[in-house]
């Protein structure tokens, strides 16, 4: 049986990666959402939850005992050392869950898999995928989208962008680059063109 490559979908914050992920899901791909996994491991009952509290203090908790991601973000974004400490706690747990989900999907016969992961390069998880797709927009567009979406000031948005590998560097390491600075239809057409080169229509008839 022909097995499709696992796509590693990445990009910069507010580059529109979720749009590409949604289009691929509509086309029949199973999506492993690393951001969702990262949120899940910071809920009560997970080992990373207590480690983060022990490291950054109880002031990051909400009244009902959840980790307030906004408070945690203010501590780590703009402070590389603290961000590295947080990543050293969360990345191993995220990796463990991703491997588990890939195994579950492939064992059940699903071979159209997309790993949607913003920090694919930063977390050194490229070995999990066969092909790397980077969603690209110019930095000024990133800033505009991030400020509008999250209500950040320009400095707050820049701090979050600077906490990731520059998007231009990710583009250099990509197998596929999707320009998401235009319309959704333009983005969709790019994706369909790429998949047609894979003879995707033949696979879709399996």
Swiss-Prot record:
PANTHER family: BIFUNCTIONAL COENZYME A SYNTHASE-RELATED, DEPHOSPHO-COA KINASE-RELATED
Superkingdom field: Bacteria
Top class in the EC scheme: transferase
Record keyword Thylakoid present: no
Protein name: Dephospho-CoA kinase
GO BP, sorted A to Z: coenzyme A biosynthetic process
HAMAP family: Dephospho_CoA_kinase
Residues annotated as domain DPCK: 6-206
Keyword set, alphabetical order: ATP-binding, Coenzyme A biosynthesis, Cytoplasm, Kinase, Nucleotide-binding, Transferase
Gene3D superfamilies: P-loop containing nucleotide triphosphate hydrolases (3.40.50.300)
Coiled coil region boundaries: none
GO molecular function terms noted in the UniProt entry: ATP binding; dephospho-CoA kinase activity
Positions that bind ATP: 14-19
InterPro entries referenced in this protein's UniProt entry, alphabetically: Depp_CoAkinase, P-loop_NTPase
Its biological purpose: Catalyzes the phosphorylation of the 3'-hydroxyl group of dephosphocoenzyme A to form coenzyme A.
Subcellular location field: Cytoplasm
Entry keyword Lyase: no
GO cellular component: cytoplasm
Reactions that this protein is recorded to catalyse: 3'-dephospho-CoA + ATP = ADP + CoA + H(+)
Enzyme Commission numbers on file: 2.7.1.24
């Amino acid at each position: 049986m022909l097995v499709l490559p696992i796509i590693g979908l990445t990009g910069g914050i507010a580059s529109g990666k979720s749009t590409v992920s949604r289009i691929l899901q509509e086309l029949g791909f199973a999506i492993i959402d690393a951001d969702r996994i990262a949120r899940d491991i910071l809920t009560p009952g997970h080992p990373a939850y207590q480690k983060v509290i022990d490291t950054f203090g109880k002031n990051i908790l909400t009244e009902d005992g959840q980790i307030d991601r906004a408070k945690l973000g203010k501590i780590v974004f703009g402070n590389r050392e603290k961000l590295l400490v947080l990543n050293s706690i969360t990345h191993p747990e995220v990796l463990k869950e991703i491997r588990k989900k890939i195994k579950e999907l492939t064992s059940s016969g699903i071979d159209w898999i997309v790993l949607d992961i913003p920090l694919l390069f930063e977390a050194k998880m490229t070995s999990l995928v066969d092909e790397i797709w980077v969603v690209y927009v110019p930095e000024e567009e990133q800033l505009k989208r991030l400020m509008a979406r999250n209500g950040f000031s320009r400095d707050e948005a820049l701090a979050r962008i600077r906490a990731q590998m520059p998007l231009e560097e990710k583009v250099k390491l990509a197998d596929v680059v999707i320009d998401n600075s235009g319309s959704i239809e333009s983005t969709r057409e790019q994706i369909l063109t790429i998949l047609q080169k894979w003879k995707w229509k033949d696979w879709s008839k399996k």
